[in-house]
From Swiss-Prot:
Protein name: tRNA 2-thiolation protein NcsA
GO process annotations (BP): response to heat; tRNA wobble base 5-methoxycarbonylmethyl-2-thiouridinylation; tRNA wobble position uridine thiolation
InterPro entries, A to Z: CTU1-like_ATP-bd (IPR056369), Ncs6/Tuc1/Ctu1 (IPR000541), Rossmann-like_a/b/a_fold (IPR014729), TilS/TtcA_N (IPR011063), tRNA_thiolation_TtcA_Ctu1 (IPR035107), TtuA-like_LIM_N (IPR054306)
Covalent cross-link Glycyl lysine isopeptide (Lys-Gly) (interchain with G-Cter in SAMP2) as placed by the record, residue numbers: K204
PANTHER family in the record: ATPASES OF THE PP SUPERFAMILY-RELATED, CYTOPLASMIC TRNA 2-THIOLATION PROTEIN 1
Highest classification ranks of the organism: Archaea, Methanobacteriati, Methanobacteriota, Stenosarchaea group, Halobacteria
The keyword Nucleus appears for this protein: no
Transport as UniProt keyword: no
Family (UniProt): Belongs to the TtcA family. CTU1/NCS6/ATPBD3 subfamily.
GO molecular function, one term: sulfurtransferase activity
Alphabetized Gene3D superfamilies for the sequence: HUPs (3.40.50.620)
EC number(s) reported in the record: 2.7.7.-
Reported modifications of this chain: Sampylated at Lys-204 with the archaeal ubiquitin-like protein SAMP2. Polymeric chains of SAMP2 are also linked.
Role, per record: Required for thiolation of mcm(5)S(2)U at the wobble uridine position of tRNA specific for lysine (tRNA(Lys)). Probably acts by catalyzing adenylation of tRNA, an intermediate required for 2-thiolation. May also act as a sulfurtransferase that transfers sulfur from thiocarboxylated SAMP2 onto the uridine of tRNA at wobble position. Required for cell growth at elevated temperatures.
Length: 321
């Protein structure tokens, strides 16, 4: 199998496009898609300058997606005076798993010479995920606890780091799964929120207010291609599933999508093309509907619809066991 562009041995065949690419042309293709997404989403404001630079905080977990995203962003903007890249890693406290991925984060940040911040659940909340899973006071999946804690720390420390944007390594598979889940739940208001929260053109989004705007530059690249890119570039990615992973519904959607993609190549791209258009339309229709005024949490000061935020209620519940 030869590369369509140069005749060298191909390392991959993209069934959705018919392309056969060698290692160099494949990696260039991934990088091109990430850079195109950055342009199409207008991530870099027109007024960004060396005197008024943007700070982009990257959620760096050490997994393949965030490692590849950080590598490509550094390759693209590492010497651009209009942008400062900062890597933010959250250590949840999962024995035998997170320490290895943190090592990957530290190695990558040192290799790229970018500012790297490490934050732990234990330091910030006085808990570790292993203990939370064992106690499970709310009888919830581990991911339900972890999602609340991670979002809080990413938002809080991105703000402390002066972030203009918070970037995460969600790939095409991740986003197509989320799109299908929103379709199946029939929640158009959630689709509208998705546009303003992370997938919309920045010039068309509603202002994020006190929250850090989010972006997903890797969302046009399939998961397997992200993994292949990490391998070919010999990046220090920790490719192991979290031992507490428990999103059963998303797992079903993942298997459904993989089967559809196998039988009908291009399904994920088609889903996202339609979903992004629908998200923009629903954002115009539902934007602001049901919006509630946010208060400062009585305990930690974070924004919440009630008096005490979800994170603080969970911590109280865990400590009571």
């Amino acid at each position: 199998m030869e590369c369509d562009k140069c005749g060298r041995d191909a390392v991959m065949h993209a069934a959705y496009s018919g392309a056969h690419l060698c290692d160099d042309h494949f990696c260039a293709s991934v990088e091109k898609r990430v850079r195109r997404r950055i342009r199409e989403d207008n991530m870099l404001p027109r007024d960004a300058s060396p005197e008024n630079p943007q700070t982009w905080v990257i959620g760096l977990s050490g997994g393949k997606d965030s490692v590849v995203l950080t590598h490509i962003l550094d390759d693209t903007f590492g010497r651009d005076p209009r942008i400062e890249l900062v890597a933010l890693t959250i250590h949840e406290g999962i024995e035998g798993y997170r320490d290895k991925s943190v090592d990957a984060c530290v190695e990558l940040a040192e290799d790229l010479d970018i500012h790297h911040e490490l934050v732990t659940y234990e330091d910030e909340f006085g808990v570790q995920m292993d203990d939370v899973v064992e106690k499970d006071p709310e009888n919830m999946a581990a991911c339900a606890y972890c999602g609340v804690f991670r979002r809080d720390l990413l938002e809080r420390f991105a703000d402390e780091l002066g972030a203009d944007k918070l970037l995460t390594g969600h790939n095409l598979d991740d986003e197509a799964q989320t799109a299908l889940m929103n379709f199946f739940e029939g929640d158009l208001k959630q689709v509208a929120k998705h546009f303003d929260a992370s997938i919309g053109d920045f010039e068309k989004r509603r202002d994020a207010g006190e929250f850090i705007p989010r972006a997903k530059p890797l969302r046009d690249v399939p998961e397997k291609e992200v993994a292949l890119y990490a391998h070919l570039k010999d990046l220090p990615a920790h490719i192991t599933e979290c031992p507490h992973s428990s999103e059963a519904y998303r797992g079903e959607i993942q298997q459904l999508l993989l089967k559809l993609e196998e039988n009908h190549p291009g399904t994920r791209h088609s889903i996202m093309a339609g979903y992004e258009e629908l998200a923009e339309l629903t954002a115009r229709e539902y934007r602001g509907e049901g919006r509630v005024d946010l208060n400062d949490c009585e305990r930690c000061g974070s924004k919440t619809a009630g008096d005490v935020c979800r994170k603080c209620r969970l911590i109280e519940s865990i400590e009571a066991v």
